[in-house]
UniProtKB/Swiss-Prot annotation:
It catalyses: NAD(+) + ATP = ADP + NADP(+) + H(+). Belongs to the NAD kinase family. Its main location: cytoplasm. The keyword Cell membrane does not apply. This is NAD kinase. It is found in: Cytoplasm. One of its GO terms (cellular component) is cytoplasm. GO terms for molecular function: ATP binding; metal ion binding; NAD binding; NAD+ kinase activity.
Length: 305
């Protein structure tokens, strides 16, 4: 399977735009309504994700479930942060509906368009002029007594960790059926390139460019300093067995979780489903890194020494 791709070309304009918002944010109704009106004036039809519509009271537009958006919309514009985009991305996985991330608050790695810039870049993007990136997803299942008890998708990461405040978890990690190591730690992160700038980064993992399709294993506060992050090929299957743990759980993009017992196995592999992120023409991933991570190598806005 080929690596995630980044492409830029003039394509067919979008006709129906779904709006998804971080509806728990106070005051988001105004920006959402303004964005919807602007898209209508630009010549596209607008629908709202149902929970966004109900929570904000913006009921003057068709309100669709994620499944219905997958069938009826051509593109989804997400107003919020990376967490909002993560949630809808998993729901739309497999529907071939690309996502445009508009940031409402701090700049995100995926919601990379500032709200104040949206009216200057959105017409071109909805008209078919944009840069597209395909991002891989992880699929994971929890196996107990040889029977799957839980499964979920993740765009960022699958995290096995201790839930309580005391004690470590002991994990036995295998890759493609080959035993790798036993690890005593606060947990283990299995991350995509997309997730390498999230929890994995704060745990000491490397940054992977989003067009890379490998996985990275990142221990969380390991007991042994020799347990280091390792990058694996895209087709690797990672199995994590809980050897001992007082109170452990597995999280998927830190948005859904299930509790674990000793003997449980968590199997993580690349999903056949992907998502597509759209950016304005001229999008610069390194500029996003510089702004988010405060890499102040250049003292001026025009990147000159």
């Amino acid at each position: 399977m080929s690596a995630p791709q980044k492409t830029s070309a003039l394509r067919t304009p979008f006709k129906t735009v779904a709006l998804v918002g971080r509806y728990s944010t106070a005051g988001i109704e105004g920006p959402l309504e303004e964005l919807a009106s602007y898209i209508l004036r630009n010549g596209q039809d607008v629908v709202f994700e149902r929970e966004t519509s109900l929570a904000t009271g913006l009921t003057g537009y068709p309100a669709l479930t994620a499944e219905e958006i997958g069938r009826e919309a051509d593109v989804a514009v997400v107003l919020g942060g990376d967490g909002t985009l993560l949630g809808i991305a998993r729901q739309l996985a497999g529907h071939n509906v690309p996502l445009i991330g508009v940031n409402h608050g701090r700049l995100g790695f995926m919601t990379d368009i500032p709200l104040e810039d949206v009216q200057s870049v959105l017409p071109d993007m909805l008209g078919g002029r944009y840069e597209a990136e395909t991002r891989l997803l992880l699929e994971s299942s929890v196996v107990r007594d040889d029977s799957p008890i839980f499964s979920a998708l993740a765009l960022n990461d699958v995290v096995v960790n201790r839930s309580g405040i005391s004690g470590m978890v002991e994990l036995a990690v295998s890759v493609d059926g080959y035993f790798m190591y036993n690890q005593r730690s606060d947990g283990l992160i299995v991350s995509t390139a997309t997730g390498s700038t999230a929890y994995a980064l704060s745990a000491g993992g490397p940054i992977l460019h989003p067009t890379l399709s490998g996985l990275v294993l990142v221990p969380i506060a390991p007991h042994s300093l020799s347990n280091r992050p390792i990058v694996l090929p895209q087709e690797a299957e990672v199995t994590i067995e809980v050897a001992t743990a007082r109170d452990a759980s597995v999280n998927f993009d830190m948005q859904s979780l299930t509790s674990l017992l000793p003997g449980d196995r968590i199997v993580v592999r690349r999903s056949k489903k992907t998502i597509q992120l759209l950016h304005p023409v001229g999008y610069n991933y390194y500029a996003t890194l510089r702004k988010k991570l405060h890499w102040h190598e250049y003292p001026t806005e025009d990147n000159r020494l």
